[in-house]
Structures are given as structure tokens and as C-alpha cells.
Amino acid sequence: MFDIGFSELLLVFIIGLVVLGPQRLPVAVKTVAGWIRALRSLATTVQNELTQELKLQEFQDSLKKVEKASLTNLTPELKASMDELRQAAESMKRSYVANDPEKASDEAHTIHNPVVKDNETAHEGVTPAAAQTQASSPEQKPETTPEPVVKPAADAEPKTAAPSPSSSDKP
């Protein structure tokens, strides 16, 4: 892969031994070997995926060629039935797009608040200057009506205490 000869590998090993020392050199070699292993596996994976995609593309191209060749040899009855099937499939696709379950689900989970909508319509003609003058106007207190004072029932009638039997009353 790297086209390194034995003498060059020995030279790299000696330089690594001098720079890193005998204690850190094995750890560095293991780390570099792990990186090389990961890069090789990544390259192999990418290569396999590209090969599969190319095979799939070639298969699809050959399938299209066969379909075109077979369509020219079809009888008019088969062509008519294939056209009907295509139209049915298109209408199903259109109806599915029109009744998209994700949109219906989103609509079902949406909270509609008419108060906020009415609030927005109430503030349509208000400019920032008008809002500022309204905010800086003196505070108005709401009118209060005095509430009648109601006496609790416990205070209205005095209670008479009935003698309760106690443990000292026993004969």
C-alpha cells in the first residue's frame, strides 16, 4: 500500500525509538496500526458500497432496456391494461398526497387558540406611537362596590355547652 521497503521501515523504527524512547514506542506503533486498520476498513467499505451502487445502476439500466423492448412487442390489449394500471397508480398517489397522514397528524396536534386570533385583529390598526401614548397614560382604577359584611353563623348564636361524661363521673 505505501510501497515501503525493509530498509526504509527499519530507518523509521530507529528514528521512532530515538524520538519516543523504548517505553512510548510500542504504544505509538499500536496507535498508528489502529489508524491504518481503520482507514483500510473505511476504504474497503466505501469501495464495496460503490461497487454495489454501480451493479444496481447497471441492473436498472438493463431492466429498462428489457421493458422498452417488451413494450414494443405487446399486444394492444396489454398496452391498454398497462395504461389503466398506470392511471390507477397515479390517482392513488394523488389521493395519498391529498390525504397525507403526516399533515393530518400535525393538524390534530396543533393547538388552535381563537383568543390569540381575536387579539391580533384587535391590534391591527394600532401604531407604535399610539401604543406608547396609551402605555404612558395614568393608571385607571376600576370602580369597586362595597361588599356587605356577613356574620358567620357561629358568632350569631351562642352555643350552650352540654355536660360531657368524663372518667371522674363513673360510679
From Swiss-Prot:
Gene Ontology biological process terms in this record: protein transport by the Tat complex
Any one GO molecular-function label of the UniProt entry: protein transmembrane transporter activity
Topological type in the membrane: Single-pass membrane protein
Compositional bias of kind Polar residues: 130-139
UniProt keyword Transferase, yes or no: no
InterPro entries per the UniProt record, alphabetical: TatB
Gene Ontology cellular-component terms listed: TAT protein transport complex
Main location: membrane
Subcellular location: Cell inner membrane
Region: Disordered, residue numbers: 117-171
Known partners and oligomeric status: The Tat system comprises two distinct complexes: a TatABC complex, containing multiple copies of TatA, TatB and TatC subunits, and a separate TatA complex, containing only TatA subunits. Substrates initially bind to the TatABC complex, which probably triggers association of the separate TatA complex to form the active translocon.
Family: Belongs to the TatB family.
NCBIfam families xref list: tatB (TIGR01410)
Name recorded for this polypeptide: Sec-independent protein translocase protein TatB
The organism of origin for this protein: Escherichia coli O6:H1 (strain CFT073 / ATCC 700928 / UPEC)
Lineage summary: Bacteria, Pseudomonadati, Pseudomonadota, Gammaproteobacteria, Enterobacterales
Protein's gene: tatB
